[in-house]
Amino acid sequence: MLIDTHCHLDAQEFDEDRDRVIAHAVAAGVRAVVIPAIGRGNFQKVRDLAHGMPGGVYALGIHPLYVGGAWDDDLSALRACVEASMDDPRFVAIGEIGLDFFVKDIATGAAREKQERFYAAQLDIAAEFGLPVLLHVRRSQDIVLKHLRRHGGLHGIAHAFNGSEQQARGFIEQGFALGIGGAMTFPRALQIRRHAQQLGLEHLVLETDAPDIPPAWLHAPDKRNTPGQVAGVAQALAELRGTDVMTIAAGTAATALRVLPRLEAVVA
């Protein structure tokens, strides 16, 4: 069973042919697609998309790149929306949340402080409702981990993970799986490929981050990623590990269901 644990299917890049993209994913054997929100403005859209497609599920959260334009009452709105969604079997997590220190303008000073405050507040919401989190950890792994350790008891996915071995172990010890996607398909992505090859499948999940992070076979200025490419990511991971794609699909799907337990009701 193939599961794309991170796909921004609501993005405008899919507005012209979203139904065709979904059909391609289904034809490629993708049983479930997790669609994370990026802010208050698309909570309803990700919910509607999830309900309108086979195997669609959604997460609610405020992405660190959009925290700058968010207001404190967006956190209140998030909590209210989460509470109202707890009976919805298509709602599986809090996300996409976390920290981004790659973008220099938001990596220091007041912008960074706001990022951390919103991240911590969203971890509080996840803890209150017993939900997993989908984490954005770009150049921020240690501080993301620091907040997780303060909260304790949370679990989920470190999306598009590209940290050190020590950082990988830190997330795993906190109950998190690591998201493996298109970046792993590039031979020069040595650190990501090492994690993908050496860590047990019980610590890995597949993702696309579509329309972003296209795999090597799509890498060009005019190429967008799609959820159906998770099948190719699974094949590339199988080749890297010297195993078959069925083993990869089964192992990573089992991990996804463990860290996102509400997903079970949709794929059962």
Give the ranges of each region predicted by the language model.
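Mid-domain alpha/beta scaffold segments of enzyme catalytic cores
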Residues: M1-A268
